[in-house]
């Protein structure tokens, strides 16, 4: 998208200077805000704020007592093999997180485990460490299989196993949809120790790849189990569970919540599991600052660019509800000289992996994504999450903002709220058990950016429309050629 938008900027001399104008206005605005008193700016902004009904939190609401805290000062206290302890040190893992402290000891003792913890709590290492510790004692192929709901999460889990097993000679492979089946079959024939897979593609290989079997599987992990079931993987999971052995198999189930579906799944697949719950309700980590910004109609793009100016030098994920918005905003950011890349479901697997790699490597500071990126992706350096579109359910909000403030780090999320989003925000606040504070801004200052942002957005929309027409024309051309070939075939007969 960056390259394509770059061509647009050359078409218009006016647009090429928009970024410079916005930067200059932003600097001027910052000086004005520093000169203005806080009291004045608050009174200016409060005149235009949208009134929102406050929800009272019931005083008699039942609160579950937290379990007694389990802590370890280092990974060495868990009695891991030296190679694993050294790998943790190399990764700057100073001490186990709460879910790791709860889940690793019973897992090392051989128990099935149910891990319930909020997003960003270090769940992946909580099951990877005990598996690798056991693998060191008994190395054999197809030792463990991890099931994940998305291709991106599966790749992240593979990277965690590779990092933690870097001193142990561990072989891993990632088996997901959207990639070549034959290449994956060759990877499986190399006898990896750990297989990380999405359920559908794993089932394809179990049924169609000669010589591949999980009859000697020792560990099965179902990560983000609530999402696995939400995405209708239930029937495939049932088929997989019937194929793989139950005797001699240890099973770990990790989820953000304990629903009735998950309870049914754990009864079907786990034996006398140890439940390790760090949090029994949806919540966000303490190091995350969550705010909202009330946006008048038609100004969401302008407010977004204002925020990106404020956060120059930081890494930002912008979440949208649609693929078109993700593409458009990525183009808008690039046209205005913010380095951005898009991640959404219309991209093929190589494009999605490429976008993530650019962001993780710091070659792009902004990732504009649909909810495909909201769950499970471990990108440690995300500073800011911006909800350009408010998610329609509270779970999605929790998982979006959980992309920042991970594993003890601090972070911030800002939600851009229009008058049509108030009901959605009230639901989110009810789940969080608190009201989200409003960002105090001078809307008159933000409005100075409006003309430049609107002009740039118009250029991006025109370019997207042009590309869509070209794509449709190519599609018609292909269909025409296919129909002509079919007619020729009929005539020959």
Curated annotation (Swiss-Prot):
Basic and acidic residues compositional bias, start-end: 26-42, 51-62, 483-493
EC main group: hydrolase
Top-rank taxon, per record: Eukaryota
Catalytic activity, as annotated: ATP + H2O = ADP + phosphate + H(+)
Residue ranges of every copy of the Helicase C-terminal domain listed in the record: 307-453
Compartment(s): Nucleus
InterPro entries reported for this sequence: DDX47/Rrp3_DEADc, DEAD/DEAH_box_helicase_dom, DEAD_box_RNA_helicase, Helicase_ATP-bd, Helicase_C-like, P-loop_NTPase, RNA-helicase_DEAD-box_CS, RNA_helicase_DEAD_Q_motif
Primary location recorded for the protein, binned into one broad class: nucleus
Entry-linked SMART domains: DEXDc (SM00487), HELICc (SM00490)
Domain notes: The Q motif is unique to and characteristic of the DEAD box family of RNA helicases and controls ATP binding and hydrolysis.
Assembly: Interacts with the SSU processome.
Function: ATP-dependent rRNA helicase required for pre-ribosomal RNA processing. Involved in the maturation of the 35S-pre-rRNA and to its cleavage to mature 18S rRNA.
Name of the protein: ATP-dependent rRNA helicase RRP3
Native organism: Candida glabrata (strain ATCC 2001 / BCRC 20586 / JCM 3761 / NBRC 0622 / NRRL Y-65 / CBS 138)
């Amino acid at each position: 998208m960056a390259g394509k938008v770059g061509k647009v900027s050359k078409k218009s001399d006016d647009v090429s200077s928009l970024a410079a104008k916005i930067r200059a206005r932003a600097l001027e605005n910052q000086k004005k805000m520093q000169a203005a008193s806080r009291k004045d700016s608050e009174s200016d902004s409060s005149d235009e704020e949208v009134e929102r009904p406050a929800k009272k939190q019931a005083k008699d609401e039942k609160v579950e007592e937290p379990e007694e805290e389990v802590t370890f000062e280092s990974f060495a206290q868990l009695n891991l093999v030296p190679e694993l302890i050294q790998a943790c040190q190399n990764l700057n893992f100073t001490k186990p997180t709460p879910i790791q402290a709860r889940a690793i000891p019973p897992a090392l003792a051989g128990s099935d485990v149910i891990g319930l913890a909020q997003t960003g709590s270090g769940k992946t290492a909580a099951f990877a460490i005990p598996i690798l510790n056991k693998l060191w004692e008994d190395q054999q192929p197809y030792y463990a299989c991890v099931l994940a709901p998305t291709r991106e999460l599966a790749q992240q889990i593979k990277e965690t196993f590779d990092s933690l097993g870097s001193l142990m000679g561990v072989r891993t492979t990632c088996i997901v949809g959207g990639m070549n089946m034959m290449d994956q079959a060759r990877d499986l024939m190399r006898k990896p120790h750990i297989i990380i897979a999405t359920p559908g593609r794993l089932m394809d290989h179990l049924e169609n790849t000669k010589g591949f079997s999980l009859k000697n599987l020792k560990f099965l992990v179902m990560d983000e189990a609530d999402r696995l079931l939400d995405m209708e993987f239930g029937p495939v999971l049932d088929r997989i569970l019937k194929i793989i052995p139950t005797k001699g198999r240890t099973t770990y189930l990790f989820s953000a919540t304990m629903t009735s579906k998950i309870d049914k799944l754990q009864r079907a697949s786990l034996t006398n599991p140890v439940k390790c719950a760090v949090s029994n309700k949806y919540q966000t980590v303490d190091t995350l600052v969550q705010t909202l910004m009330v946006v008048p109609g038609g100004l969401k793009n302008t407010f977004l660019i204002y925020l990106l100016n404020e956060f120059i030098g930081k890494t930002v994920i912008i979440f949208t509800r649609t693929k078109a918005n993700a593409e458009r905003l990525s183009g808008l950011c690039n046209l205005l000289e913010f380095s951005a890349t898009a991640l959404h479901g219309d991209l093929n697997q190589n494009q999605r992996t490429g976008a993530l790699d650019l962001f993780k490597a710091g070659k792009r500071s902004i990732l504009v994504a649909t909810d495909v990126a909201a769950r499970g992706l471990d990108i440690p350096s995300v500073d800011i999450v911006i909800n350009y579109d408010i998610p329609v359910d509270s779970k999605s909000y929790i998982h979006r903002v959980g992309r920042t403030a991970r594993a003890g780090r601090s972070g911030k999320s800002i939600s851009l709220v229009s008058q049509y989003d108030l009901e959605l925000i009230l639901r989110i606040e009810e789940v969080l058990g608190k009201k989200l504070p409003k960002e105090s801004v001078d809307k008159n200052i933000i409005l100075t950016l409006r003309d430049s942002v609107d002009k740039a957005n118009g250029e991006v929309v025109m370019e997207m429309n042009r590309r869509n027409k070209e794509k449709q024309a190519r599609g018609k051309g292909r269909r025409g050629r296919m129909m002509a070939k079919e007619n020729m075939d009929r005539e020959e007969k």
